[in-house]
Each structure stands twice: as C-alpha cells, then as structure tokens.
From Swiss-Prot:
It holds the Pfam family Ribosomal_L16. InterPro entries: Ribosomal_uL16, Ribosomal_uL16_bact-type, Ribosomal_uL16_CS, Ribosomal_uL16_dom, Ribosomal_uL16_sf. Part of the 50S ribosomal subunit. GO terms for biological process: translation. Belongs to the universal ribosomal protein uL16 family. One of its GO terms (cellular component) is cytosolic large ribosomal subunit. Binds 23S rRNA and is also seen to make contacts with the A and possibly P site tRNAs. This is Large ribosomal subunit protein uL16. GO terms for molecular function: rRNA binding; structural constituent of ribosome; tRNA binding. Transmembrane segments: none annotated. Keywords: Ribonucleoprotein, Ribosomal protein, RNA-binding, rRNA-binding, tRNA-binding.
C-alpha cells in the first residue's frame, strides 16, 4: 500500500478540506480519466482497491496513472482508553480529495473498456466521480 517513505513530522492536525482542486484538475498523461465531483478522503486501501479493479478489467492492456498519493497520517486511540495522554499512533494514510481532482488516468485501450474499468473503480470510492476525456489544445 502507498505511504510516504519518510516525513518531517509523524503526526498531523486534522485540518479542513475546503476549496476546489486547481492543480491536478486536467487529464495530463492518459486519454481518459476519473475525476472527483465531491470532496472527501481517499485511504491507501481505497486507492489500491480501485487500482486492482482497473487492472483486472483491462487485462494487461494499456497504461494506468495514479494521480493521487496518501500523504496525510490519520491517528486513532485504542479502544477503552481515557481522554488525554497524548495523540494516538498512526493507523492509516489518506489523501484529501477536492472537487475537480483527477484520480486515475488510462491510455492504450478502447474508450468503451476504459469507461467500464473506471466505472467499476468509482464504486470503490467514498465520493462521487465522473469520467472525463482529454481535451486537445
């Protein structure tokens, strides 16, 4: 599963997920992509589950780009522990997703197969998505 090799600090504040995605909001590498419509968090497990789904559907054809990386640690205190005594240990890693962010990109397969693969992958994610094509400039 994806997680940073090393970080400056082990734990992070919760923060607020506001605004729209301006960076990473266009299909840059492939021909067709999966774009978020709502905001949320995408865990490393969800990124991997969606990637596996796409890989199984396209069967060794084409290329996949994963445009998100889980770089935010989420901590959790053990069950039945009283309040206080410090922040809990890191449980898993997430990526904060803003509306408009491209999550996955595909190339080298038919558009119909790509749409099917991305639709299956979208079912694994906790927010609404849409399929977008690359715009030629």
């Amino acid at each position: 599963m994806l997680q940073p090799k090393r970080t400056k600090f082990r734990k992070m504040h919760k923060g607020r997920n506001t605004g729209l995605a301006h960076r990473g909001s266009t299909v840059a590498f492939g021909q067709i992509g999966l774009k978020s419509l709502t905001r949320g968090r995408m865990t490393a497990r969800q990124i991997e589950a969606a990637r596996r789904t796409i890989t199984r559907k396209i069967k060794r054809g084409g290329k996949i780009w994963i445009r998100v990386f889980p770089d935010k640690p989420i901590t959790n205190k053990p069950l039945e522990v009283r309040m206080g005594k410090g922040k809990g240990p890191v449980e898993y890693w997430v990526c904060e997703i803003k509306p408009g962010k491209i999550l996955y990109e595909l190339e080298g397969i038919s558009e119909e197969l790509a749409r099917e693969a991305l639709t299956l992958a979208a079912a694994k994610l906790p927010f609404k998505t849409t399929i977008v094509k690359r715009t030629i400039m």
